[in-house]
C-alpha cells in the first residue's frame, strides 16, 4: 500500500490561456500599431492618414486611400483597372496566389494608375500597394506604369509615382526583370519632353524597383523611416565583411548621403506635392 503511494504518478497541472490574437484587437474597430503596439480606433487612425498617434510610425496606406489623400475630391480617373497577370512560366500555384491577393485587397494588381487633380492641377499618378504580392514588379505593373507615363508624355502632364515593393516578381523570371528597363525608357521620353517626374518612396522600396523607376525622379521624396535599398542588410554585410550603420537603408540615411531630396511627413504630403506642382506649372507656362 505504502509502496504504491510513493510510486504514484503525479498529475501535472496546466493553466489554459486564451489565444491573445483572437481577442487582442477587435476586427475592423481597432488597429494595433506594428511598431509601438498601441491600440487605436481605426476610424481616428484613418483620419490621421494611418500615422500612429503614439510613436509617429507611418502605417501602410492602401493605394486608393493614398490617391484620395493627394487629389481633389472626385478628380481621379483610373486607367487599365482590369489588367491582370498571366503565368508565362507556368510557375506552380502562381495564379492561385494572384487570385487570393485579388480577393484580399480588391485590386487586380499591385499598382493603381490614372490621372487626378491637386488644387486644380492635373497630373498622372501610379501608386503601388504592398498588400498585393508585396508590391513585387511583374509584367502588369511594368505595363501599367509605362502606359500612364506615356499618357503623361503625350498630354504634357507631370507624373507622380509612389513606390512600395519587395522587388522583382520571381514567378515571372526575366520578364519581371525586363520591366526595369522598360519603365526607365518611358521615363526618359517623359524627361526629354521637359516634364516633371516626382518619385515618392514609401516603406519598403527594395530590389528591382529601387534600382529602376523609384530612384530616377527629378525630385525624390520619401516617408520617414522608410526602408529603401537593393540587397538585404545581411547579404551586404556578409559580402563586404563589415558591420553596417544602424540607420543604413533608411530614408534619413539616404537623405544625409544625397540620394533623396526630402523626407516628408505624411501629414505634409499633400501640401508638399501641391507646392512642387505649382512651381512646375509656373516655369512651363
Swiss-Prot record:
It catalyses: N(6)-carboxybiotinyl-L-lysyl-[protein] + acetyl-CoA = N(6)-biotinyl-L-lysyl-[protein] + malonyl-CoA. GO terms for biological process: fatty acid biosynthetic process; malonyl-CoA biosynthetic process. Zn(2+) binds at residues 33, 36, 52, 55. Pathway: Lipid metabolism; malonyl-CoA biosynthesis; malonyl-CoA from acetyl-CoA: step 1/1. It is an enzyme of class 2 (transferase). Binds 1 zinc ion per subunit. Its EC number is 2.1.3.15. It is found in: Cytoplasm. Keywords: ATP-binding, Cytoplasm, Fatty acid biosynthesis, Fatty acid metabolism, Lipid biosynthesis, Lipid metabolism, Metal-binding, Nucleotide-binding, Transferase, Zinc, Zinc-finger. Its cofactor is Zn(2+). Residues 29-285 form the CoA carboxyltransferase N-terminal domain. Pfam families: Carboxyl_trans (PF01039), Zn_ribbon_ACC (PF17848). One of its GO terms (cellular component) is acetyl-CoA carboxylase complex. InterPro entries: AcCoA_carboxyl_beta, Acetyl_CoA_COase_Trfase_b_su, ClpP/crotonase-like_dom_sf, COA_CT_N, Znf-ACC. A zinc finger (C4-type) spans 33-55. GO terms for molecular function: acetyl-CoA carboxylase activity; ATP binding; carboxyl- or carbamoyltransferase activity; zinc ion binding. Belongs to the AccD/PCCB family. It is not known from which strain the crystal structure is derived. Acetyl-CoA carboxylase is a heterohexamer composed of biotin carboxyl carrier protein (AccB), biotin carboxylase (AccC) and two subunits each of ACCase subunit alpha (AccA) and ACCase subunit beta (AccD). NCBIfam families: accD. Component of the acetyl coenzyme A carboxylase (ACC) complex. Biotin carboxylase (BC) catalyzes the carboxylation of biotin on its carrier protein (BCCP) and then the CO(2) group is transferred by the transcarboxylase to acetyl-CoA to form malonyl-CoA. This is Acetyl-coenzyme A carboxylase carboxyl transferase subunit beta. It comes from Staphylococcus aureus (strain COL).
